Amino acid sequence: GEQPTATLRQERFFIGDHQPSDALWPIPLFANQPLDDILTEREKTFTANGDVRLNCGLNGHFVTHYDPATRDRLIEKAAELPTLDKICLLQDMTLLARSGRESSAALLPLARVFQHETNERVFNKAGTNLVELRKFVDDSEAGRARLKQISAEFARDTFMELGWDEQDGESDDDRERRTAALGLMLYGEDSAALTEVKRRFNETNPDDLPAEIRPLIINANIRYFEMPEMIDKLFTIYQNTPSADLQVDIALSLTSTKNPATAERILAAIQDANIIRPQDASRWFIYLIRTRENRQIAWNWLKENWSWVKDTFGGDKSYDNFIRYAASALLTRDELNDFTKFTKPLRAEPALTRTIDLGIREIAGRVALIERDKAAVIDALKN
């Protein structure tokens, strides 16, 4: 029969708005079979021996976009690849999805291939792909339920293997994998994990919890078992602990509340220097606005309290943080329109002009990505 061929074509890679580019580069291919070492032309066809894989060993600075059939075969066998090639595939797929060259739905089968991965970087990257999908189910309850279920399933074997507690002589890889797996189990509302997380929180002082999983333990207790006295206790510890790490863990946890009254209390504390120091205020704000249930509350607060932000941070290089952080979290078309409208009069301030323009671009890109891929992602989650 005829010798199979593979055609390689190069073009400049962009995410978001851009001017077209016809630049050509000499590209070292690092292929899995003898092709040219370097691709210098726009397009070239080679005889191929089976599927071509490029950038083996993650040596090149380029993104590889395979045709759908090759991509699917590659995903199927991805668990057998060398570690760096797994990382390459995961990184490229994320970038291709963000740029609109691949559907974000393709992140799902690729992530699930690495369920039994022992390398921490690969396991983490695959888990991060599942996290990337959360923005697509922001307003779909059925989609969220499926993503939670899939996230817990993905992490369960790894977590059962490693257990809750660090073993003597355990590798850094195992420590990192435990944290990633537990995070996915708790997002997935695994009932055994939630029962244990509650027990540990009730029986141990927050500062005595193991540092690696402490933020996850406190966070899950606020998210799923919140009681008013818990909030009081954590605010008190926050104000009195000498540990900056514990303060960050408490801020991350309190802001994950599902209770609007607690969110309002946090926003009041942001304006009270006796509770939250001004230099930490924007950190609390970003954690809060990134929590699905609190995004609108935090955004409304920013609009209503802008004069306080200006009075407090106007002369400081952190002044634009609140705008930048809001832009990193907003994700619906209504939120984009509202952000644009609110920031329009602020653009006249030189300290804010660039941040506002970048923010509008960032939200618009996210909205376009969600509108483009949402149906396909929800469909992939169903199957």
Predicted segments, located by residue:
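Extended low-complexity, serine/threonine- and proline-enriched intrinsically disordered segments
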Residues: 26-32
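Short beta-strand/turn micro-motifs composed of small residues
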Residues: 10
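Long, ordered, helix-rich scaffold segments
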Residues: 1-7, 16-21, 33-383
